[in-house]
């Protein structure tokens, strides 16, 4: 947003939304806006109401007792390393970070093969080193109506020292959500190296699962023999899950994760792990083909973390899709009074809680739309499609290409387990 004037953003009932400054530039200040109840497959508009004063400045304080806290989590930081030493879930009564792990939560890990690229051709890792941040500083804490934010800056191998590695931890005020953000400039390096982020979860007897297009995979179990069992490609979420709870991670910029532990033998089969540790793999040049041997430039990425008693794939899928897919927004110019009113509308939603709408496109026939659906928990149910008022909409079951299966128009469809 380009103005520094006092303003409110209000919904159709006149209720003001919470806003929080993110950053300022010469052309103005940018804000985060907390908008709730956005309709599925629809939209919600708000009005911007200007005031006469100036917008409030961000509230900055020092990090006290190395900790942040809200109704859901208590975070204890290690300011010397710019990491999280403890993440305690108050609802579950659980510590989420493994205290015995070599790497704390959020640790920025640089890995080098010490110039020995032939290890990859021999499929062994026996000559390597790993390091984390040095010269770490904490500029302080920013508190707002949406979240509290702690920033750390430090230096790392393979990264521009002047720019540094910048880490931000956000603890949201009213939802069970923690975010980790990273910003650094990668220096060109032809020797084999990689960068990871550490997420050493503590959850007894937990299995690591992740979703791929069309389903959920248990790491090392539900995979075709011989496929990658160390670095997995993740679509929307990774979950550390046992019978009582699950810890969830989602990120939009980094699709590769090493699940289990940082490996000395990443090509080992079959893949097993003792603890549910997760390592997003930010970047690497571990290849032996004729791709460019170095990577360089600024790189930004982020991860969303949550935890819940609900151990279903449905809960994990809803979290992952919501966290990874951005909410599209537009600022519309002022118009007539009627057109500028706040409003909302939903065109379509699923009437079955464990059915996910994965895509919606115009049908090739030019008549209607083709909706791709996925049942997430292997449960029986009744599929219905509802409009904004909750009225059941007629539909025809079709295959993936849009060809009708039987041609009948129905308002419900029985789902088999």
Label each residue range with its predicted role.
Residues 1-417:
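C-terminal (or distal) subdomains of carbohydrate-active enzymes
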């Amino acid at each position: 947003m380009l103005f520094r004037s006092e303003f409110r953003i209000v919904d159709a009932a006149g209720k003001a939304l919470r806003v929080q400054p993110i950053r300022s530039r010469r052309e103005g200040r940018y804000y985060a806006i907390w908008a709730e109840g956005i309709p599925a497959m629809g939209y919600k508009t708000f009005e911007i109401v200007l005031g006469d004063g100036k917008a409030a400045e961000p509230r900055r304080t020092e990090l006290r007792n190395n900790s942040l806290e809200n109704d859901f989590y208590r975070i204890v930081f290690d300011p010397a390393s710019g990491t999280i030493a403890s993440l305690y879930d108050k609802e579950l009564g659980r510590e989420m970070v493994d205290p015995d792990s070599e790497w704390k939560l959020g640790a920025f890990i640089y890995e080098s093969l010490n110039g020995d690229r032939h290890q990859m051709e021999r499929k062994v890792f026996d000559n390597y080193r790993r390091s984390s941040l040095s010269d770490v500083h904490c500029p302080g804490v920013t508190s707002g109506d949406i979240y509290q934010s702690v920033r750390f800056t430090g230096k790392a191998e393979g990264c521009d020292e002047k720019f540094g590695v910048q880490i931000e931890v956000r603890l949201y005020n009213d939802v069970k959500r923690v975010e980790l953000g990273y910003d650094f400039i990668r220096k060109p390096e032809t020797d084999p190296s990689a960068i990871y982020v550490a997420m050493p979860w503590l959850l007894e007897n937990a299995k690591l699962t992740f979703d791929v297009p069309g389903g959920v995979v248990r790491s090392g179990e539900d995979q075709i023999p011989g496929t990658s069992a160390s670095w997995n490609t993740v679509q929307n979420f990774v979950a550390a899950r046992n019978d009582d709870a699950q810890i969830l991670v989602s990120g939009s910029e980094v699709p590769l994760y090493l699940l289990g532990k940082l490996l000395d033998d990443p090509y080992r089969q079959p893949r097993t792990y003792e603890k549910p540790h997760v390592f997003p793999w930010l970047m690497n040049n571990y290849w032996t083909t004729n791709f460019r041997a170095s990577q360089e430039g600024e790189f930004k990425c982020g991860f969303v973390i949550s935890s819940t008693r609900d151990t279903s794939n449905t809960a994990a899928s809803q979290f992952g899709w919501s966290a990874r897919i951005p909410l599209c927004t537009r600022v519309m110019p002022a118009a007539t009074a009627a057109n500028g009113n706040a409003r909302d509308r939903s065109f379509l939603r699923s009437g079955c809680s464990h059915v996910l709408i994965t895509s919606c496109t115009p049908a090739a026939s030019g008549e209607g739309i083709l909706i791709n659906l996925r049942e997430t928990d292997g449960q029986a149910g009744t599929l219905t499609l509802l409009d904004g008022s909750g009225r059941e909409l007629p539909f025809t079951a079709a295959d993936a290409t849009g060809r009708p299966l039987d041609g009948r128009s129905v308002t419900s469809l029985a789902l088999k387990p």
